[in-house]
Curated annotation (Swiss-Prot):
Name this protein carries in UniProt: Coiled-coil domain-containing protein 6
PANTHER family: COILED-COIL DOMAIN-CONTAINING PROTEIN 6 (PTHR15276:SF0), H4 D10S170 PROTEIN-RELATED (PTHR15276)
Main localisation: cytoplasm
Region annotated 5 X 29 AA tandem repeats, chain positions: 106-235
Disease: A chromosomal aberration involving CCDC6 is found in papillary thyroid carcinomas (PTCs). Inversion inv(10)(q11.2;q21) generates the RET/CCDC6 (PTC1) oncogene.
Native organism: Homo sapiens
UniProt biased composition (Pro residues): 426-451
UniProt KW keywords: Acetylation, Chromosomal rearrangement, Coiled coil, Cytoplasm, Cytoskeleton, Methylation, Phosphoprotein, Proto-oncogene, Repeat, SH3-binding
Sequence repeats: 106-134, 135-163, 164-192, 193-206, 207-235
Domain observations: The protein has mostly an alpha helical conformation similar to myosin heavy-chain tail that might adopt a coiled-coil conformation.
Motif (SH3-binding): 442-451
Residue positions, PTM Phosphothreonine: 349
Region (Disordered): 1-47, 342-369, 397-474
Domain of life per record: Eukaryota
Length: 474
């Protein structure tokens, strides 16, 4: 491009110089013709062109201006030539630089491609190493998980046995306490009935004694009235009509024996009142003591029932957790087996206790603790030890069958037991009050509360007290 521009500049400069030369020649021819014409005119004016001085001066000026322009154009031509040479040099340098840059770019590209190829090879080696490490880690994790699963199953069986023994002990203890409470309640009810009967007997006895005393007093009053009338007759006094015993007032003087008997009756009434108050106080204290004991027994029974419920909930939560862990392990094993089957039965280590039959061409190590055979292999975990010999939980077993020479193994078929994945509650011993075999019997109802009225229910009169009544009477 620089060469073509320089050539066009040189061509333009040559054209301008040729045009200026043509103009100069034309001007000179015109000036010569003018001179010749002048000469001819001077000679004979035969037919030449007459140029006026003004026109001649104008042409002279024009010629001078054209010469000046020609000089300017020559100077510009020289400058353009210099520029063209500089551009040609610059173009040459740019070509050299482009060649150098292209060679350097090729070298850098080759270096980058070599570096990337080395990195790709290193990544491939690292990938192979990671694959080997992953297989080793997977095999280690599988063996570790199988070992932990077996350990969990053993711990589960031990926990089931321990929990069952503890639950049986708690149930027996609770049943003993319930029977003891029932016996105490029955004995207290019998004691209460006996006290009630004794109270009624004491009330009847007291009423009979009071009636006997009143009758005896009336008889003595009648006797005294008769003696009074006899004395009045002896003293020849007019006998007044005998007053009614109910009209006798305290103002009438009584004999000394009547006063003594009245004092005795008052003392007897005071003594019986004291005995009645003491019996009522003793009865209230015993009833409060019985109520307090019954409240303590109810609280103890409720606390034991709550403790039993917490133990049962903890056992059920533990069973659920164990069953969930086993089911998750089964699902992982089944998914892994399906992936292995889809990939062409590549031999891998499998987690115990699910047996797996590898292909005959397998050369990888097999996880220890697994038994392989060509016939049907089934794993059944140890059943939980129960009191009645029943298995409350059966873990699922996977069976692998031999299908001939075409395939070494088939897809395992998970088979779950029909028994629920929970522990059943142990059957407590039958209670005398209830027939429900699952739940413990409810606490016995409280004895009927008797209104605390002033009575002599708890005081049992001694033979000396009963014998004191006839002996103390005059």
């Amino acid at each position: 491009m620089a060469d073509s521009a320089s050539e066009s500049d040189t061509d333009g400069a040559g054209g301008n110089s040729s045009s200026s030369a043509a103009m100069q020649s034309s001007c000179s021819s015109t000036s010569g013709g003018g001179g010749g014409g002048g000469g001819g005119g001077g000679g004979g004016k035969s037919g030449g062109i007459v140029i006026s001085p003004f026109r001649l001066e104008e042409l002279t000026n024009r010629l001078a201006s054209l010469q000046q322009e020609n000089k300017v154009l020559k100077i510009e031509l020289e400058t353009y030539k210099l520029k063209c040479k500089a551009l040609q040099e610059e173009n040459r340098d740019l070509r050299k630089a482009s060649v150098t840059i292209q060679a350097r770019a090729e070298q850098e590209e080759e270096f980058i491609s070599n570096t990337l190829f080395k990195k790709i090879q290193a990544l491939q080696k690292e990938k192979e190493t990671l694959a080997v490490n992953y297989e080793k880690e997977e095999e280690f994790l599988t063996n570790e998980l199988s070992r932990k699963l077996m350990q969990l199953q053993h711990e589960k069986a031990e926990l089931e046995q321990h929990l069952e023994q503890e639950q049986e002990f708690q149930v027996n203890k609770l049943m003993k306490k319930i029977k003891k409470l029932e016996n105490d309640t029955i004995s207290k009810q019998l004691t209460l009935e006996q006290l009630r009967r004794e109270k009624i007997d004491l009330e009847n006895t007291l009423e009979q004694e009071q009636e006997a005393l009143v009758n005896r007093l009336w008889k003595r009053m009648d006797k005294l009235e008769a003696e009074k009338r006899i004395l009045q007759e002896k003293l020849d006094q007019p006998v007044s009509a005998p007053p009614s015993p109910r009209d006798i007032s305290m103002e009438i003087d009584s004999p000394e024996n009547m006063m003594r008997h009245i004092r005795f009756l008052k003392n007897e009434v005071e003594r019986l009142k004291k005995q009645l108050r003491a019996a009522q106080l003793q009865h209230s204290e015993k009833m409060a003591q019985y109520l307090e004991e019954e409240r303590h027994m109810r609280e103890e029974n409720l606390r034991l029932q709550r403790k039993l419920q917490r133990e049962m909930e903890r056992r059920e939560a533990l069973c659920r957790q164990l069953s969930e862990s086993e089911s998750s392990l089964e699902m992982d094993d089944e998914r892994y087996f399906n992936e292995m089957s889809a990939q062409g039965l590549r031999p891998r280590t499998v987690s115990s206790p699910i047996p797996y039959t590898p292909s005959p061409s397998s050369s990888r190590p097999i996880s220890p603790g697994l038994s392989y055979a060509s016939h049907t292999v089934g794993f059944t975990p140890p059943t939980s030890l129960t009191r009645a010999g029943m298995s409350y939980y059966n873990s699922p077993g996977l069976h692998v069958q031999h299908m001939g020479t075409s395939h070494g193994i088939t897809r395992p078929s998970p088979r779950r037991s029909n028994s629920p994945d929970k522990f059943k509650r142990p059957t407590p011993p039958p209670s005398p009050n209830t027939q429900t075999p699952v739940q413990p019997p409810p606490p016995p109802p409280p004895p009927p509360m008797q209104p605390t009225v002033p009575s002599a229910a708890t005081s049992q009169p001694t033979p000396s007290q009963h014998s004191a009544h006839p002996s103390s009477q005059p």
